[in-house]
Amino acid sequence: MINSEYKKRRASVISKIKDDALMILFSASEKYRNNDVTYKYRQSSNFYYLTGVNDPSTILIMSKNGRKISTTLICKRPNDLDKVWHGQVPSKDSYKKKYDIEYVIYSDEVDKLSVGNASNLYYEFSDEYKLIDLLQKINFDTEVSRYLKHNNFQSSKNDLYNLVCDMRRIKSDFEINEIRKAANVSVEAHINLMKSCKPGMNENEVEADFVKICKSKGGEQAYPAIVASGKNACILHYTRNNSKLRSNQL
């Protein structure tokens, strides 16, 4: 997706918040399955909507004071350990160039970040503990942090989650075109399955064929595939996908 689309969204969200405001949005955290193995990463939908960044350990900060608007992305500093195990982490210059964001700093530099003491805070309420930790690191008004911690600072707390979700309900021409592309890929994958599936196959084989078509067209699954044959088709969110397809069954 082109950067101009994300910039339009950021401009739109900042126009919807009050003046003298600080908006903070956190990326989704990585989820560990066991030991050092994580589940496949899934970015926060709202964070991705405003940035296009699909990496963990990133934070978007926007401030609004009259006509003065500032946008900062906080990212992880590249290191040799990540380079060996997961591949090179992008540098702040790479983020700045790729996503066209005004300022980019590393997470170990946040104590140097000056955001003032805005009277209105916008964030997703589910991230409150992350927020308190960040505000203390960036020397934001400690009284605000204390009130937030004790849940008494209601007048300046604004839920960013609902605000961004409302924005996402209305699709731009660019988004509508992307949705059509995704629908066309899905149609092609479904037609392919109608031609190829037969009794004796396993549901997971059908799933593999479906995913193969989607990935070959540059697509990703919006949710786990539901491949349900026979009585499994009565289960609304069936995802085991491990039964054999039998004759005369749907």
Residue spans of the language-model regions?
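A composition/biophysics-driven feature that prefers long, compositionally simple stretches
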Residues: M1-E188
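Generic, well-ordered alpha-helical scaffold segments in large soluble proteins
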Residues: A182, A189-N192, S196, D209, ...
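Residue-level marker of positions within ordered structural domains that often coincide
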Residues: N65, N184, I191, K215, ...
